[in-house]
Amino acid sequence: MPNLKAIRDRIQSVKNTKKITEAMRLVAAAKVRRAQEQVISTRPFADALANVLFNLLNRLKFGDVSLPLLQQRDVKTVGIVVVSGDRGLCGGYNSYVIRRAEQRIKELKEQGVNYRLVTIGRKATQYFSRREAPIESKYTGLNQIPTADEAATIADELLSLFLSETVDRVELIYTRFVSLISSRPVVQTLAPLTMQGLETEDDEIFRLITREGKLQVERETVTQTMSSFPQDMIFEQDPVQILDALLPLYINNQLLRALQEAAASELAARMTAMSNASDNAGQLIGTLTLSYNKARQAAITQQLMEVVAGANAL
């Protein structure tokens, strides 16, 4: 016969665990909203910057501009930036982005191209360190909601690696936020920039909304139209110098947005994982309660039978 006290203790333990997972779900949901607000707040600057770059490149003719960040080189070494989380309890978030990085590394090896890693997040750092991969830099302990200063620090090092020709291309592997239950690891080239890299048409931003008491994601398609500069506009500085100053800002902004999307993906994955854990805990509590009631009923029945048997013996 099952031990009633053991079942009762286990029920209480699962209830306590459910309280923790539910609290973690609510915290993650609140932080997803903050990540969303940050993405939206940085959008006007990104739009204005893209518009200026678009017009400058059109005015100067892209192919005629000789700037380091626009120069295509023979690719011998690729710098791969892998963005992961610092903690677990977020489903397959970390394993998916690491798997995508491994896949990209395999592709480069098959092409005879070397690679150098820049890891962001403790999980990616630990994974590749254990495998003695060539890690150029490691970044851990960043804010859960990435800041512009953090992105600028990382972007400066990436630009240094590219401009010093330590690497011939910089690729960013991060998790793009799709929905609360879906995310997708993607590969984006940060440097060198191409004309396609400045296109923002049909870009999307996400909004976390509450509908009928449930959290949902609403994606908004950005249909930005680039406004052209007047043909007789006179630049106080050389347009090439302006472009040279703005390109690092653009890369910095792209990195910041990728970090924000990755953070939102991690928080959404954690929220989903904790929601599933809470649901599973509720089901387990129901199963244990049923087992407890059956065991208690069996114990009472056994006691009654013993009393009746004793009375008959008299």
UniProtKB/Swiss-Prot annotation:
Entry-linked InterPro entries: ATP_synth_F1_ATPase_gsu, ATP_synth_F1_gsu
Which Pfam families does the record cross-reference, listed alphabetically? ATP-synt
Keywords of this entry:
ATP synthesis, CF(1), Hydrogen ion transport, Ion transport, Membrane, Thylakoid, Transport
One GO cellular component, as annotated:
plasma membrane-derived thylakoid membrane
Q: Which domain of life is it from?
A: Bacteria
Q: Which GO terms describe its molecular function?
A: ATP binding; proton-transporting ATP synthase activity, rotational mechanism
Where in or outside the cell it occurs: the entry states: Cellular thylakoid membrane
The annotated topology with respect to the bilayer is: Peripheral membrane protein
The record's listing under HAMAP family reads:
ATP_synth_gamma_bact
**Family indicated by similarity:** Belongs to the ATPase gamma chain family.
Provide the assembly information.
F-type ATPases have 2 components, CF(1) - the catalytic core - and CF(0) - the membrane proton channel. CF(1) has five subunits: alpha(3), beta(3), gamma(1), delta(1), epsilon(1). CF(0) has three main subunits: a, b and c.
Function summary: Produces ATP from ADP in the presence of a proton gradient across the membrane. The gamma chain is believed to be important in regulating ATPase activity and the flow of protons through the CF(0) complex.
User: What is the name listed in the Swiss-Prot or TrEMBL entry for this protein?
Assistant: ATP synthase gamma chain
Source organism (scientific name): Crocosphaera subtropica (strain ATCC 51142 / BH68) (Cyanothece sp. (strain ATCC 51142))
